[in-house]
Amino acid sequence: QPMVDSELGLTAVFNGIIYNYQQLREELHAQGYRFFSTSDTEVLLKAFHRWGKACVEHFKGMFAFAVSDRRTGELVLGRDRLGIKPLYVAQVPGALRFASSLPALLAGGGINTDVDRVALHHYMSFHSVVPAPRTILQGVRKLPPATIRTVCPDGGSEDWTYWEPTFTRDGTRSAGDWAEVRQQERPGERRSHLRVLRPTEE
C-alpha cells in the first residue's frame, strides 16, 4: 500500500493493519490534518508528521513500513512490537533494499544468497526459527521487532527499540482475576479488528 503525501513531503510503503487508526484519524483531524482517503496508510503518514518516529507508540496493530522524508532525506523503517509483519533488508553497492518478503527482495539480484551458518544453527536449534536480525541468507537481514531504523542520506543508520515486554509479576491479582480482565478486553479487541476489515480502496 504505497502512498505519497505531497503536502507533507512524505512517502510511505506500508504492510499491515493499524487497528486503532480510526481513533488516531479523529485525533489528527482535530489537530488540523486534512485527509484525502480512508486508509490506515494515510493515518501512518499524518501520525509520522505529527509525532515523528514516536508515532509507533500510538499504534495498535501489526505492521511493517518505510517512510521517506523529502525534507530530511531520511528513510525510516519500522516494525510492530512482536514482529508479526516481516521487514527484510539488504545492503547492496550504493543502495539499501527492503521488502516484506524474501522473493521480492531477491528479485533484483546482486544479493549474497549463501547460507548463513549461524542462522542455520538457530533454525535447527529453535524449531525452524531464526531470531532477528539474521535470516537464513548471508546477504539479507530482518529488522528486529519493535524497532525503528533511521537511514541517513550518507548511508549511516541508527536503531531505536521503542518497546520491550515487561515480566514483573503482579502479586495483587490471582489467576482468576487475570482471566476476568482478559475476558473483558476481548469484545473491544474484536470490535477494533472488525472495523479494519473493510473493502480495499481502488
Q: PLM features: residue spans?
A:
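Cysteine-centered catalytic environments shared across enzyme families
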Residues: 1-202
